[in-house]
From Swiss-Prot:
<feature type="binding site">
    <location>
        <position position="427"/>
    </location>
    <ligand>
        <name>[4Fe-4S] cluster</name>
    </ligand>
</feature>
<protein>
    <recommendedName>
        <fullName>3-isopropylmalate dehydratase large subunit</fullName>
        <ecNumber>4.2.1.33</ecNumber>
    </recommendedName>
</protein>
<keyword id="KW-0004">4Fe-4S</keyword>
<keyword id="KW-0456">Lyase</keyword>
<dbReference type="InterPro" id="IPR001030">
    <property type="entry name" value="Acoase/IPM_deHydtase_lsu_aba"/>
</dbReference>
<keyword id="KW-0028">Amino-acid biosynthesis</keyword>
<dbReference type="InterPro" id="IPR036008">
    <property type="entry name" value="Aconitase_4Fe-4S_dom"/>
</dbReference>
<dbReference type="InterPro" id="IPR004430">
    <property type="entry name" value="3-IsopropMal_deHydase_lsu"/>
</dbReference>
<dbReference type="GO" id="GO:0051539">
    <property type="term" value="F:4 iron, 4 sulfur cluster binding"/>
</dbReference>
<keyword id="KW-0479">Metal-binding</keyword>
<dbReference type="InterPro" id="IPR015931">
    <property type="entry name" value="Acnase/IPM_dHydase_lsu_aba_1/3"/>
</dbReference>
<dbReference type="GO" id="GO:0003861">
    <property type="term" value="F:3-isopropylmalate dehydratase activity"/>
</dbReference>
<dbReference type="GO" id="GO:0009098">
    <property type="term" value="P:L-leucine biosynthetic process"/>
</dbReference>
<keyword id="KW-0411">Iron-sulfur</keyword>
<comment type="pathway">
    <text>Amino-acid biosynthesis; L-leucine biosynthesis; L-leucine from 3-methyl-2-oxobutanoate: step 2/4.</text>
</comment>
<comment type="function">
    <text>Catalyzes the isomerization between 2-isopropylmalate and 3-isopropylmalate, via the formation of 2-isopropylmaleate.</text>
</comment>
<feature type="binding site">
    <location>
        <position position="424"/>
    </location>
    <ligand>
        <name>[4Fe-4S] cluster</name>
    </ligand>
</feature>
Length: 483
């Protein structure tokens, strides 16, 4: 019987399996940041242990890093707890070591799920873990990647393994071509809207179909990033020519000259590429669940509530809880409407916003910057007067550098956007970038829970194009009219 992509990677990394199904899984790559690592390093220190395989660790600071004030250096980190976590990471990596460390303000520093792939730390067929739930992002490369807790971070550091039980296989096929203006973010929001935030619970999802294959690697990362929001611990996309081409010349990838940083190929690259090409589900592989979507029917999406599954197309209206027969769902809708300050039946394109955030590990790569800048340039207007703040936060120093080479920063700044330094920023209320109570935000991030972007803040999840258009109009609009 054929095997799924998930089966193949799992089978190659299982060290031992108990009768109850609990397995010891070997971990290839461990991504580390400043929030979930301090306790793990301290645990190693107290036990007198060393990191088992230093070459597996790639570290950066991202959650707490400020996106302004870099001219002040570490003194620009105004929150003392944030500063302590960042300096503690510096000290821990100095003591324990890492294959690569991109500290605060370094050229390659950025969001861990952006810097991993762009530096070649994420390779097809790997098992990848990080103390962050959106580690599923790396599944775009045909890698088995998922988040782990702080105690597991220590366990992986000490043993290079993880205790896990194998999940079931789910296939989500998105066939056909999307219409103009519909992006990877819209595809994954539509998927979550269909299966719900618990639909993928107990599964590893493989995203497939012509619409997924048509996506760039950046787009595939966006889709896999939000697999966790659909309830799955991990999401995968099969390796193809786009995957392999993307990896050429990446800092830590095989075939890259360590001095020039350029792709030179060679036997190691050839062997790796041949293996990577096998990383797809067999034609006769069976899945425990299959979900299908027609890409042509997916419209630009906007979340309206306090869960990613509370999402509608821009043509829709805010739902009426009275029309929901299920009492639990009706109650959830009512609570969401109250928190979000919305009334049933209100058109989504009538929602005025206070702030705009373009960034996060979901949408802060160069393709996202280009997408948003193109919309701003095409519309040719400045940020609307009712919008208090519109900020663009590149996902890494390399993304920022590339965007500035292309002049994208000038487009944003001329239109009244703030062009920031890289970091997690307003995705979560853990740094200086946050919403005030009652403020409504068009955000390209991945979570719209109560208080996610700041106590009392109201988050609407959208694509970079939708966020950019909302910034200059002051409210949500159908992006298809402007592309």
């Amino acid at each position: 019987m054929g095997r799924t992509l998930y089966d193949k990677i799992w089978d190659e990394h299982v060290v031992h399996t108990e009768e109850d199904g609990t397995s010891i899984l070997y971990i290839d790559r461990h991504l580390v940041h400043e929030v979930t690592s301090p306790q793990a390093f301290e645990g190693l220190r107290e036990a007198g242990r060393k990191v088992w395989r230093i070459s597996s660790i790639v570290a950066t600071a991202d959650h707490n890093t400020p996106t302004t004030g870099w001219e002040l250096g570490y003194d620009g980190i105004t929150d003392l707890v944030s500063k302590e976590q960042i300096t503690t990471l510096d000290a821990n990596i100095k003591e324990f070591g890492a294959a690569a460390f991109f500290p605060f303000m370094s050229k390659r520093q950025g969001i861990v799920h952006v810097i991993g792939p762009e530096n070649g730390a994420t390779l097809p067929g790997m098992t990848v873990v990080c103390g962050d739930s959106h580690t599923s992002t790396h599944g775009a490369f045909g890698a088995l990647a998922h988040g782990i807790g702080t105690s597991e971070v220590e366990h992986v550091m000490a043993t290079q393994t993880l205790l896990a039980k194998k999940a079931k296989n789910m296939l989500i096929k998105v066939e056909g071509a999307v219409t103009k203006g519909v992006t990877a973010k819209d595809i994954v929001l539509a998927i979550i809207g269909k299966i719900g935030t618990a639909g993928g619970t107990g599964y590893t999802i493989e995203f497939a179909g012509s619409a997924i294959r048509a996506l760039s690697m950046e787009g595939r990362m966006t889709v896999c990033n939000m697999a966790i929001e659909g309830g799955a611990r991990a999401g995968l996309v099969a390796v193809d020519a786009k995957t392999i081409e993307y990896l050429k010349g990446r800092l830590l990838a095989p075939g890259t000259d360590s001095v020039t940083g350029k792709f030179v190929g060679g036997p190691e690259w050839d062997m790796a590429a041949r293996y990577w090409a096998t990383l797809h589900s067999d034609a006769d592989a069976t899945f425990d669940a299959v979900v299908e979507l027609d890409a042509s029917q997916i419209l630009p999406q906007v979340s309206w509530g306090t869960s990613p599954e509370m999402v509608l197309s821009i043509e829709d209206r805010v739902p009426d809880p009275e029309k929901e027969k299920d009492a639990n769902k009706r109650g959830a809708i009512e609570r969401a409407l109250t928190y979000m300050g919305l009334e049933p039946g209100k058109a989504l394109n009538d929602l005025y916003i206070d702030k705009v955030f373009i960034g996060s590990c979901t949408n802060s790569r160069i393709e996202d910057m280009r997408e948003a800048a193109a919309v701003v340039k095409h519309i040719g207007q400045k940020v609307a007067k009712n919008v208090k703040l519109a900020m663009v936060v590149p996902g890494s120093g390399l993304v920022k550098e590339q965007a500035e080479r292309e002049g994208l920063d000038k487009i944003f700044i001329a239109a009244g956007f703030e062009w920031r330094e890289p970091g997690c920023s307003m995705c979560l209320a853990m740094n200086a970038d946050r919403l005030e109570p009652g403020e409504r935000c068009a955000s390209t991030s991945n979570r719209n829970f109560e208080g996610r972007q700041g106590a009392g803040g109201r988050t609407h999840l959208v694509s970079p194009a939708m966020a950019a258009a909302a910034a200059v109009h002051g409210h949500f609009v159908d992006i298809r009219k402007f592309v």
